[in-house]
Amino acid sequence: MKKQLKVIIYVDILFAVLLLFFWFSLPKPLFITPTSYVLEASNGELLSASIAKDGQWRFPLADSVPEKFKHCIITFEDKRFYNHLGVDFIAVVRAIRQNMQAKSVASGASTLSMQVIRLSRKKQRTIFQKLAEMWMAVRFEVSYSKEEILTLYAANAPFGSNVVGLEAASWRYYGRPAENLSWGEMATLAVLPNSPSLVRPGKNASRLIIKRNNLLDKLVEEKIIDRATAQLSKAEPIPSAPLPLPQNAPHLLNRFKDEMKALKVNTTRITSTIDENLQKELNRLTAQYHQKFAANGINNLAALVINIKNGSVVAYVGNCYLPQQKEMESHVDMISARRSPGSTLKPLLYASMLNDGFILPQTLISDVPTQIGGYSPQNFDLGYDGAIPADRALSRSLNIPAVKMLQQYKYERFYDKLKKFNFSTLNKPADHYGLSLILGGSEVTMWDLSNAYLGMARTLNHYNDYQGKYNNADYGSAYYVKDQEKPEEVIEPTSLLDHGTIWSTFNAMEEVMRPGDEGLWQQFSSSQRIAWKTGTSFGFRDAWSVGLTPNYVVCVWVGNADGEGRPGLTGIEAAAPFMFDVFRLLPSSKWFEMPKTKLKRIAVCKQSGYKASPICETKLVQWVPPVGEKTALCPYHKLIHLDAAETYQVTNQCYSVTQMKHKSWFVLPPTMEYYYKTKNAEYRILPLFMEGCQQEQTAVMEMIYPKANASIYIPLEIDGNRGKAVFNVAHRNNNATIHWHIDEEYVGTTKNFHQIALSPKPGKHTLTLTDQNGERLVQVFTVLDKEK
């Protein structure tokens, strides 16, 4: 009895050990082979793919297997697939009998389950390994459904050369997804894993045709297809050389590779938000412009299109992809590259100053020769307007007014604002950039720049959705993974920019003159309204254009990846036409809704753009952000006293008060006036004082160059002698005569046109100017000696 009990215990232990061995004999995961990175459009169509790390074209596991492939592979490899548990014993007996009769391996008995095990283990084919495969195949069937087994087989079966898996084979041999293959094409692929090294497209074509046709005949016998379908399928040609896979978004594919961990994606396949048709059209358009630009030595360009309503990227062309021409550097993703932004940050400064109550939309900004601590900005046309409305300065992209605005706003404050806009490339202190920050003195990426304008547009679009409040998640990044988790809404009473500010800024951006025939856009009712801004970096290295409607943000860049500048490489000439052609690919939309509760109507001085003072001559009522009510009153309108004929200014010391006429007069500072009157014929110069009248303390002269306490450098000429600097002063009287003295030494006299070339010695000097009426202007300047 005890002996029998021991036997039972030993048997139970042995059974338990075998059961444990059986259960843990199947490795997890089954396959650890690297897979290709695969990028799909939003509709599931393949956009781009890259080869796996081991040099194989092997797509990640698919969700399902096409029905045609199921029928073909089961008929060809394992006709009792749905009726066995991993091992087909009928096939085993048949194989043993046939092999004994042939005295060699003439037939196999591997089921699809056994083949999956063999593919995962990669062991040599021996009797022992065959038995191990049978054991593990049974275990495999316990844990996996038949559909899962077919899916694993289809993803890992060899299809000749370096092609693994049905999906990769379908694209490599037929150039389209497996779901779209015919019966003949699917039958061809189904016979390849049986002997991929012997029978593959491009080699042994006759044997491949025989195997395919035999399979088609079996499908007829099984009544899966009819004879007519089989005959038509047999007439189809077999593929020859492998085809290249689609590369419609290679730069986005590489971006996905780099960001895979951050995206928390556990597969090398993603379905993106890209619109397949738009992406292909944008690739075509990019190629056209590349051909045009290449003649001027401009090799690279990029375009990004974002759907504002949901923040999804719908088209991503990081460069004109020309891998066969390595000198073009088309592999560089210019959407991620750091480049000088040129003037593309100016709307953000304009908006920030509106939002914080520094200006109104049309506040006059100084546009005169400027030197700030050795920094001398220049307008692109090298001219000066004297003074120009802020919105007009933005639409014309004038540099000097932008620097003046940043000087008023403080570059440290603007730097902090840009950080809140999530510009990731501002990795140096604000002092490193200084005032050049507004003229391209930093580096940005197309991605960050587009996201800044995306955030503004989304905020304005959501004006009604949040009852005038703000979802600060609107300033989050755009996304390109279709099922990417969206950030939670964060509803706040305030935001980076209020609705009224954004609406006013977009209106100013809409007034930019469009290039070429686009300048006539307002004459066509079908032309949509677009807020846009161009940018050109120093040395003509980068050309930008970013635009937006309520539905889309479009950002384009043109230039050379290596930073080489080219003549004509400007935002308006190179990037803007490209951007407007991109907008033509998109559906038109209405303009942004006016956020009336976030705007107020106030009286504004027509001439200065400031909040109207009581003495402003002409007042306009304008919609401005509410903070505009707290801005300064017009500083340029002054009440002056004239004689009865309104010819001269007078005072009560020289003229009867009862005969005086009191007028409000628009008076700019002398330097601003000097340039402003040349561009504005309606500007009236302040009348002179009547002879014998004591003048009020109003400046009649102002130095244009050099400014008070300026340090200047006078370079040497070619012959080694010291050159000359052109000194320039503005006077209110067009007919004034000015006598010039340096350190009390007379150096010359000017009349009407007050410029004089001088060459003072290095050191500190006192400049004294005296006009014909005895009015004096005295200021100090220093000449630097860089020879020391």
Give, region by region, the residue ranges found by the protein language model:
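Acidic/histidine-enriched alpha-helical segments
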Residues: 88-94, 136, 167, 206-208, ...
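Short pre-catalytic segments that frame enzyme active sites
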Residues: 38, 45-59, 168, 197-201, ...
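Juxtamembrane regions of bacterial inner-membrane/periplasmic proteins
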Residues: 2-295, 312-314, 368, 404
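Glycine-rich, acidic and aromatic/proline-enriched surface loops and short helix-turn segments
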Residues: 115-122, 155-162, 179, 183-195, ...
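Residue-level preference for non-acidic, small/hydrophobic
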Residues: 44, 73, 116, 149, ...
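Conserved catalytic neighborhood of penicillin-recognizing serine enzymes
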Residues: 101-125, 179, 242-258, 359-414, ...
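Soluble, non-transmembrane domains of envelope/secretory-pathway proteins that act on or interact
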Residues: 1-5, 485-491, 529-788
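A penicillin-recognizing enzyme superfamily signal
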Residues: 272-293, 305-307, 316, 324-337, ...
